Structures are given as structure tokens and as C-alpha cells.
């Protein structure tokens, strides 16, 4: 190699190496999300829900996830098991492990829906407060918080259960400490059932009597929630038609179609072998690396 070219070679190498490093650093790892699935245990999981963060719609992912084969719903008052999802009616049913039923009653915690959540209580829910103090605000004669009509039959039915001994009452005790609660805030997002404030030992929720109003052992206990079903888009439909999962990515939580190989696209998975958010940079890096070696080889033999 000519001595006169040594400085030129040295300058070119110095100029090239930082550029090569920058190109390499700019290429992010291909985003892979292998956790999106269309089932969790025995429950089908469709949009807007997802099995993990990045799956489904971001407004729902902070409330619902799949954990060890169990689909869970989270609020500020706890984590609840989702027992069913009915997509045609846009409802989910959740089970509170501390909620009383006819067969088993116990002291319960409170229940609250987050105000910003896309969920509301369905109108067919009956919240029943059990073992309430005689000084409970639900018995305020100036505020109608208890259904004293058909609610009285529900209270008598609950107190006829053997499980009532779990909250310190005798079977068939007077239903004067029971209240079918009618929340003053209605059933919207932000619904709250604060048992300490209401001075009640336990609660239950009945979402279906199953045609057996006189037999509390056959009542369906749980909390039925209506969800906002207006999140579906044409992009999501195209994604699902191509076998992908609708999800989101990035700080702005923009739409992403997550293919079954774990890669993301901006629309669908037809013929997609690379992630739209990283492929071009990877190819660019490879080409620049090849060009750099060619430049170095040429200059060494000049």
C-alpha cells in the first residue's frame, strides 16, 4: 500500500466506523409478542380484549389479562375471575371470591368500577347487602336505597340459605338486616359498593334467577358488566381476517396487527415475514456493513 494513501485510508475508516455504529444502534430488536392468544383457559378472547399487555385494545388491557390460564379482571378493589364473555350482548361476568352465595357466606370486601373504565354494571344485576347494622345509611328513612318490594323476597331467600351462618346469622333470620341496594350513583362507570361505609358484613350479586326465583340455590351469582363495543375498526377486521391479533405498540399505543409468528404489521399478516417497525433498518445496516468491508478491502490493495 502506498504511504501516501495511509492518511486517506485512516480518515475513511474513522469516518465510516461511527456511521456504521449509528446505523447498527438505530436498528431496534424486532418486536416479538408471543403472548397474544385467542383463548385463556376455556374462554375465547376476542378484540377488544387481549391475553396480555400489547394485545387487544389499550383501553381494555389495563383491566383484563390472562394469568396461568385464568382470565382476570382488575379494579382498584381487587382482581376478579372472568367466568364468561358473551360477545353478541357485549357483556362479561366476573366472580368475586369473597362475595357471598347461597351455599357459602362470608365477610366481603368492597367493589368498585374505575371511573375511566369502559365497563358499566348491567341493569339485570341485583346487589344484595347482608348482615347490615341497624344504623346503616341504607336504612335511612329519608333516602330510598333499598328495594322494599321484590327485594324483600330476595332477602328472605338469601336468609333461608344454610350459608347465612357464615356471617353470624341464623338460618331464616329476619331479613331486617338485608337490603337489595339501589345505588344513588346508578350503574355507570365509577359504581362503588363500600361495605365499611354502608356498615354491612357481606354482599352478593345476582345476575340471573334462571326462572327459579323461589330457589336461591339455583340463582346465578356474579357481577355482569357491559363493555363498550365501539372500538372495532376496519384495520382490526383486516388483521383478524389475515389470522392476526389486534393489538397496540409504542409509547402512543398505536394499532398493531400481531401475526402468529410474533411480528407486528401496521395492517394485516398476509405475506408478512418481517416487522414493519424494524425491517428496513436491519437491511440498511447489512448493506452498509457490506459496503464498508468492500471499501476497506479496496483501499488495502491500492
Summary of predicted features, one role per range:
Residues 3-302:
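Extracellular/lumenal glycoprotein segments
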